[in-house]
């Protein structure tokens, strides 16, 4: 049976569904920032950006951009009622101090035990860029990761052990890919959802670590 991968927007929309009311959430640079566009207006979620924003909203409409309002990825945002601005140092104190309920990060690799690599591939021509990812990986109460299931070369991004430099150890709680959702639990990598038409056997073939099928029943 054939299957269709989720688009980046569909991944973001799916993550938005799992963010509880009243949560304080940091959205990492890249795909995670799209989540802001899929949070319902009547759902109180307080989005944090490491450059010193709290309670920002989705991107503005074309022509309504304010150059003073950008997130850590230099993308335009809007501010919600009650939103606030603060010093970069205060922002990192929030990140490191356990004040964020969830952070959503991208990834180069995720290991079976929840180790995360998302700042450097080790390639000689690559420019390392850790930003606040290490602070978020250890400081947030839960870490969600959004990523393609495999690289452009078809190599698994979910692996038995990291081969890239680690961002954080045993920090990932849930993985959202274009093929499935995986919970990282003491027993291993538990697949709780997968795209329609994708067999568990095919998903396992595309994954570099052993999976547990929890999609039945």
UniProtKB/Swiss-Prot annotation:
Keywords: Aromatic hydrocarbons catabolism, Transferase
GO biological process: beta-ketoadipate pathway
The EC number(s) this enzyme carries: 2.8.3.6
Pathway terms, separated by semicolons: Aromatic compound metabolism; beta-ketoadipate pathway; acetyl-CoA and succinyl-CoA from 3-oxoadipate: step 1/2
GO molecular function (one): 3-oxoadipate CoA-transferase activity
Enzyme kind, highest EC tier: transferase
Catalysed reactions, as listed in the record: 3-oxoadipate + succinyl-CoA = 3-oxoadipyl-CoA + succinate
Catalytic residues of the enzyme: 50
Subunit structure: Heterodimer.
Name of the protein in its database record: 3-oxoadipate CoA-transferase subunit B
Species whose genome carries this gene: Acinetobacter baylyi (strain ATCC 33305 / BD413 / ADP1)
């Amino acid at each position: 049976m054939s299957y269709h991968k989720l688009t980046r927007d569909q991944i973001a929309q799916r993550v938005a569904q799992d963010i509880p009311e009243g949560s304080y959430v940091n959205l990492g640079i890249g795909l995670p920032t799209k989540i802001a566009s899929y949070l319902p207006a009547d759902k109180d979620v307080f989005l944090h950006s490491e450059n010193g924003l709290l309670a920002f909203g989705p991107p503005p409409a074309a022509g309504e951009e304010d150059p003073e309002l950008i997130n850590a990825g230099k993308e335009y945002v809007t501010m919600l009622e009650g939103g606030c601005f603060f010093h970069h140092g205060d922002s990192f104190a929030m990140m490191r101090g356990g004040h964020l309920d969830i952070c959503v990060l991208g990834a180069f690799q995720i290991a079976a035990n929840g180790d995360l690599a998302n700042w450097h591939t080790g390639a000689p021509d690559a420019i390392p860029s850790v930003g606040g990812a290490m602070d978020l990986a250890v400081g947030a109460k839960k870490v969600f990761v959004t990523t393609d299931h495999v690289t452009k070369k078809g190599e698994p991004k979910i692996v038995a052990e990291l081969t890239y430099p680690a961002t954080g150890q045993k920090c990932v709680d849930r993985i959202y890919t274009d093929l499935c959702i995986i919970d990282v639990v003491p027993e291993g990598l538990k697949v709780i959802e997968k795209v329609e038409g994708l067999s568990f056997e095919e998903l396992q073939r595309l994954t570099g670590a052993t999976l547990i099928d929890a999609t039945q029943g």
